[in-house]
Swiss-Prot record:
Record bears the keyword Zinc: no
Name of protein: N-acetyl-gamma-glutamyl-phosphate reductase
Active site (catalytic residues): 149
EC number per UniProt: 1.2.1.38
Role noted for this protein: Catalyzes the NADPH-dependent reduction of N-acetyl-5-glutamyl phosphate to yield N-acetyl-L-glutamate 5-semialdehyde.
Compartments where found: Cytoplasm
Keywords: Amino-acid biosynthesis, Arginine biosynthesis, Cytoplasm, NADP, Oxidoreductase
InterPro entries given in the database record: AGPR_AS, AGPR_type-1, NAD(P)-bd_dom_sf, NAGSA_dehydrogenase, Semialdehyde_DH_NAD-bd
Regions that span the bilayer: none
Species assigned in the record: Methanococcus maripaludis (strain C5 / ATCC BAA-1333)
Length: 343
């Protein structure tokens, strides 16, 4: 049995890690940290995991990184906090999955420009943890940068077309997310009276997930791309629905496109291709699946692909566990083989 620590256990991603790991037969959670809630019972804060595993016996702890001695550490901390923690854990040889944006960019200047933070803890060996594209690199690394929620759904929706050089350099992503993607701390934007029965766009050209999407697709296609991304906030708790648009470079049919997607993802359990029906938020709610469908081509050669993920699972904690399974040599599906909560 491998041991796990969760640094930052009071947010939504920490909560989801606890829920999902309760079904994992190969690991045991020993430490869950929180400076603010230190000394309080874990299940008083997270009643949804009461009576599961050893959780009734755990209290939040305020542990320094140098005092952590588990096999695996999930850093479920805000952007900017992980870079102060991860280098110490890395030096100790601990397997790390960081759910913040701190290690998603090899180009530190790009990170600093988009996140507005000075990066102080670069680790050259950190690997971008999108298993469908980087599985072999993940296997060889001990520090994994878990992808962002929006980038996960966006990249997977267009990866087969980019990899096969079937679309031109213009790719547009329109994504709509549930409110939990904004984090556990409420704001004017996410306050119930403001978000309920409403739909709004935000950071329409300058969201920090834009360069993350772009760099991964450019790496895959080995060419420069003009990636545009606009997010929207939905009055729902979970889920991201992404509509991706680009223009085909050659005359291919919808059947051809579907075959390309099925071939590209033929060994990917967590990617489901919908030939006829459309992906939905309820179909992936609570799961680690990315559902992809649409594949419609209009009279101008514009192709439209739709993807759906749960932003807290495949977009965060579930993908983090998938990455842990890979680096630890576990079955990749361990702890993650559940269907969507539909309706």
């Amino acid at each position: 049995m491998k041991t796990v620590s969760i640094i930052g256990g009071t947010g939504y991603t920490g909560s989801e890690l606890l829920r999902l790991l309760s079904n994992h037969d190969k690991v045991e959670v020993l430490n869950v940290t929180s400076r603010k809630e230190a000394g309080k019972k874990l299940t008083d804060f997270h009643p949804q995991v009461r009576n599961l595993r050893n959780y009734n016996d755990l209290e939040f702890q305020n542990i320094a990184p140098e005092d952590i001695d588990t096999d695996i550490v999930f850093c479920a901390t805000p952007h900017g906090a992980s870079m102060a923690i991860v280098p110490t854990l890395h030096e100790k040889g601990i397997n790390i999955i960081d759910l913040s944006g701190d290690y998603r960019f090899e180009d530190i200047e790009m990170y600093e420009s988009w996140y507005g933070l000075k990066h102080t803890g670069k680790i050259e060996s950190a690997v971008y943890g999108l298993p469908e594209l980087h599985r072999e690199k993940i296997k060889k690394s001990k520090t994994i940068a878990n992808p962002g929620c929006y980038p996960t759904g966006a990249i997977l929706s267009m990866a087969p077309l980019v990899a096969n050089d079937l679309v031109d350099e213009r790719i547009i992503f329109d994504s709509k997310s549930g409110v939990s993607g904004a984090g556990v701390v409420a704001s004017q934007t996410t306050h119930f009276p403001n978000v309920n029965e409403n739909l709004g766009a935000y950071k329409i050209t300058k969201h920090r997930h834009s360069p993350e999407i772009g760099k991964e697709l450019e790496y895959l296609g080995n060419k420069r791309l003009k990636v545009s991304f606009t997010p929207h906030l939905l009055p729902v708790t979970r889920g991201i629905l992404t509509t991706a648009h680009s223009y085909l470079k050659e005359d291919v049919s919808r059947v051809d496109v579907i075959e390309i997607y099925e071939e590209f993802y033929k060994d990917e359990f967590f990617v489901r291709i919908f030939e006829e029906s459309m992906p939905s938020l309820t179909g992936v709610r609570g799961t680690n699946f990315c559902d992809i469908g649409g594949f419609e081509i209009d009279q101008h050669g514009r192709i439209v692909v739709v993807s759906a993920i749960d932003n807290l699972v495949k977009g965060a904690s579930g993908q983090a566990i998938q990455n842990m399974n890979i680096i630890m040599g576990f079955d990749e599906k361990e702890g993650l083989s559940v269907g969507g909560m539909r309706p």
